[in-house]
C-alpha cells in the first residue's frame, strides 16, 4: 500500500506529522509513505527506507477560504491529492482544513463514476468495542434519499474491505425505529435501503443507540450527522472530565489514579 501524507496543513505544522510518520514506519514497514511538504522540515524522515519526501513549497492554511485552495496547486495538500489522481498512491491523509480538503478532493481527484455526492465519514468507538461508521458527518447540509442509499453502499464496502467485516449491518439514523418514522426524505430513504440488495439493511436506529456497537454503518444527512458526531464528542469530554474530578476528589482516588 502507498499513502500520501500532507505534512504541512495542520494547526501544529509539520512536527507532529513527522513524529507520527516515524512511528508508523516502524510499525508498518511494508507501507510506503509519500510525505509532501517543505523538504527542510522533513529531514528527520530522509533515512527511513519506506518514506519518500515530495517537496511542496506552499501550504493551505486553516484561515484560507475553501475555494482559495484551487490557487495553491504547489501546496502540500494539493500535491498529495494529485498523486491520488494519478494513481501513484492508494490514499491521502491530511490534518488540514476539512472544508479545504473536501473541496480540493472534488477539484483535483473527482468522484467515483456513478456517485452523485461525496460525504464525510467518522469511525465511532462503541460500548461493545465494535467500531461504527457514521456518514455523512458534515460534507452536505441537505441530502436526498438516493444519496443516502449511495452512502450506505460506500459505507458497507468500506466496512468490508477496510474493517474486514463480512456482512456489515447498515442502519438509518432516524427519530424512531418504526419504518414510518421521520420526514418524507427519511421515509423514502428507508424504502430504498430496504430494497437495496447490495447492503444488509437492519432498519432505523435512534441517536441513543449510535454508540451501542450493534450496527456497523449508520447513514444520515450531513446536517444531522454533524450534530450527532459533535454531541458524541461533547459527551465523551464531559465523561472524562467527570471521571477525572471524581478520581482526584479524595486521597484514595489520587493514589488509585497513580496505579490505573
Regions found by a protein language model. Name each.
Residues 1-41:
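N-terminal phosphate-binding or glycine-rich loops at protein starts, especially the Walker A/P-loop
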Residues 6, 36, 54, 94-96, ...:
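Short beta-strand segments
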Residues 8-9, 58-59, 97-99, 178, ...:
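Short glycine-rich anion-binding loops that position phosphate/pyrophosphate groups of nucleotides
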Residues 12-18, 74-84, 91-105, 116-121, ...:
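Short glycine/serine/threonine-rich phosphate/pyrophosphate-binding segments
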Residues 31, 51, 132, 199:
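Short, conserved active-site loop motifs that form the nucleotide-linked donor/cofactor pocket
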Residues 32-34, 40, 141-203, 207, ...:
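Glycine-rich phosphate/diphosphate-binding loop of Rossmann-like nucleotide-binding domains
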Residues 48-89:
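Phosphate/nucleotide-donor binding subsite
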Residues 106-120, 126-130, 134, 214-218, ...:
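Glycine-rich phosphate/nucleotide-binding loop
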Amino acid at each position: 500500500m502507498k499513502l500520501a501524507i500532507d505534512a504541512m496543513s495542520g494547526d501544529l505544522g509539520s512536527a507532529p506529522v513527522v513524529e507520527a510518520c516515524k512511528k508508523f514506519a516502524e510499525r508498518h514497514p511494508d507501507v510506503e509513505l509519500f510525505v509532501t511538504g517543505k523538504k527542510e522540515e522533513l529531514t528527520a524522515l530522509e533515512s527511513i527506507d519506506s518514506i519518500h519526501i515530495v517537496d511542496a513549497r506552499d501550504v493551505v492554511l486553516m484561515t484560507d477560504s475553501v475555494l482559495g485552495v484551487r490557487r495553491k496547486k504547489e501546496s502540500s495538500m494539493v500535491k498529495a491529492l494529485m498523486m491520488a489522481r494519478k494513481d501513484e498512491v492508494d490514499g491521502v491523509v491530511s490534518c488540514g482544513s476539512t472544508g479545504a480538503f473536501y473541496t480540493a478532493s472534488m477539484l483535483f481527484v473527482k468522484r467515483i463514476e456513478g456517485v452523485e455526492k461525496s460525504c464525510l465519514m467518522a469511525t465511532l468507538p462503541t460500548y461493545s468495542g465494535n467500531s461504527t461508521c457514521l456518514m455523512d458527518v458534515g460534507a452536505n447540509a441537505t441530502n436526498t434519499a438516493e444519496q443516502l442509499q449511495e452512502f450506505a453502499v460506500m459505507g458497507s464496502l468500506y466496512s468490508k474491505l477496510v474493517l474486514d467485516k463480512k456482512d456489515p449491518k447498515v442502519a438509518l439514523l432516524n427519530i424512531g425505529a418504526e419504518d414510518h418514522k421521520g420526514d418524507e426524505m427519511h421515509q423514502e430513504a428507508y424504502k430504498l435501503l430496504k430494497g437495496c440488495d447490495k447492503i444488509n439493511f437492519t432498519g432505523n436506529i435512534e441517536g441513543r443507540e449510535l454508540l451501542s456497537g450493534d450496527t456497523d454503518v449508520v447513514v444520515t444527512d450531513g446536517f444531522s450527522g454533524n450534530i450527532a458526531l459533535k454531541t458524541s464528542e461533547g459527551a465523551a469530554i464531559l465523561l472524562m472530565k467527570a471521571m477525572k474530578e471524581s478520581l482526584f476528589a479524595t486521597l484514595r482516588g489520587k493514589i488509585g489514579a497513580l496505579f490505573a
